[in-house]
């Protein structure tokens, strides 16, 4: 990784950066497969909003990934991009029944069904959110019960057996009671993001983990990303300063390639580069990279809204899984099990 980063500093043109990204992705997938030793699946999460998502999808297929997970937009082109790899599992991330219906009907015309669907609740999830506006995040159409029941009806109307498309709920899930309730209501599985990001085994910077784990409810905010989607993260010094200036920056938005601070043109549509006044006005690549390095003063730290299962404690993955699936609270955490609700 260090060698690739050094090369990226020497060659700043887009073609070179894209090639280095593909090399890095290839290495990570092969390393993951080696570690997995034939157990489980190796999946790659790719944002639809990323300009070179077709290249990344094709590289993931060629490198031996088992599944592609895609959100941050409707991944209507995934069947075409993976046509040469019919065994590749395709898992879109969506938030409401309308989007699910649109995608399934489009894919059916291409002779493909999703291998699973992640239903991500924008009221609770971290990062980019599946709503058009911040004002929509609490809309009841995103509630898991509504989406699950409406999707089951959709599958029935399309004569698709429910077992053909497992539904995976994501966002704000932090207790075994929630897991059991969702499974009882028709979910096939659940997905956790922030909780695993701060696990002992997670390879994130220690400061990255600390920022996520120690964030209080009042520290977590929603704002518009440069990708044109609402996003949720921790109110770090950088984000606090940016939000103070957001209206001013948006009023001065203008289109120009030189506005791309990193020169990467990483997004298909970018509020900063393309002069879109209703979008965010910052370089998301630079801010996320700073977070990756653990730079609290400069980083953008995406995080879900709810309290983490173990609060501020950073614990092993095994303990997290045992708690969420079996209700077994870690003996090492003093004071007994905390009272946790979906709203944090």
Summary of predicted features, one role per range:
Residues 1-161, 338-340:
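Active-site entrance/lid segments in N-terminal catalytic domains of soluble metabolic enzymes
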Residues 45, 93, 170, 192-193:
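Generic beta-sheet signal
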